[in-house]
A protein has these predicted regions:
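A short acidic (Asp/Glu
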Residues: 51-52, 108-109, 134-136, 210-214
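An N-terminal, globular interaction/scaffold subdomain
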Residues: 1-125
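C-terminal structured domains
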Residues: 24-28, 215-220, 227-270
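Acidic, Ser/Thr-rich peripheral helices and adjacent loops at domain boundaries
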Residues: 81-88, 140-153, 240-260
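Short, surface-exposed beta-strand/loop "edge" segments at domain boundaries and coil↔beta transitions
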Residues: 47-50, 208-209, 255-263
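Structural alpha-beta junctions
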Residues: 58-68, 116-123, 141-147, 219-232
């Protein structure tokens, strides 16, 4: 891995950050023309490291410009600090980490727009707290894709709000987390016995929107009653192997009996 070029700027502004980035790219022999998108990560102090690592991993497959804004205290004096990474862990991407206090703690369009790649799609990701209506957020309005996470959003009934405010271009990681599971269930329905499913039961943690979505998806696709069962209910006997995926167990009930799919480990559903 090549040694990264990292610049630290304190008490700075967008113009100075953009100038420093241009100088780094020129010195490193890099061109932004190969970047496929700008990923804007709107994080909060204490909830940024996981999102930052995920963005860096994704950038190795999809070279991009990553802008991470970490909100600090709104009540502190105004201050904007920045780190600019070119090469190293940023791979073929450019990584800009902004830390804002006071008025700079709010990731406004004026703050972010001067750092965006020209003529490239914009993806905005709220890894923790998201607006009630992401498409109406100032940054959400300029983005082609808006990513939220109902599982981590402290907003009460975040999934309900995502549904009510859905706009084309919205994505929620609660749905993405059950993509492998949906594939397994679809495959199971193509196997004997070739009988109609008359009822289904979905098991998972109480406060898990992925499990809610899984139950709703089955009900919509199969047109049958689906019972959503909380495995953290003391009345539910838990298997030692469970609690590793959002949907821990599903029972597809047919006239001849039930087909049971269980999460065996973090990678296997059987």
């Amino acid at each position: 891995l090549e040694a990264p070029v990292i610049s630290h700027l304190q008490h700075t502004n967008v113009s100075a950050i953009s100038k420093e980035l241009s100088q780094q790219l020129a010195a490193n022999g890099s061109l932004s023309s190969g970047r496929v998108l700008t990923l804007v990560v709107l994080a909060e102090k204490g909830h940024s490291r996981e999102a930052l690592n995920a963005a860096i991993r994704a950038s190795h497959e999809h070279p991009s410009r990553i802008i991470v804004h970490i909100a600090h205290s709104e009540t502190d004096p105004d201050q904007l600090d920045a780190e600019i990474h070119v090469g190293g862990e940023a791979g073929a991407s450019e990584l800009i980490i902004l830390r804002g206090w006071g008025s700079a703690s709010k990731p406004t369009e004026a703050l972010i727009s001067g750092l965006l790649l020209p003529d490239a799609p914009i993806v905005v990701w709220w890894p923790y707290t998201a607006p009630v209506n992401p498409a109406e957020d100032p940054l959400g309005r300029i983005a082609q894709r808006r990513i939220t996470d109902s599982q981590k959003d402290p907003l009460v009934d975040a999934l309900y709000n995502r549904r009510n405010s859905y706009t084309d271009g919205d994505s929620d990681l609660a749905w993405a987390r059950i993509t492998p599971w949906r594939g397994v269930v679809a495959s199971a329905l193509d196997q004997p016995p070739f009988e109609p499913v008359i009822e289904a039961k979905v098991y998972g943690a109480t406060n898990c929107p992925s499990v809610d979505l899984a139950a709703g998806w089955l009900a919509a696709r199969l047109g049958v009653p689906v019972t959503r069962i909380a495995v953290d209910d003391p009345s539910v006997k838990k298997q030692a192997s469970l609690n590793v995926t959002p949907v821990e167990r599903v029972e597809l009930i047919r006239p001849s009996g039930a087909t049971v799919l269980e999460a065996l480990d973090s990678q296997t559903i059987g």
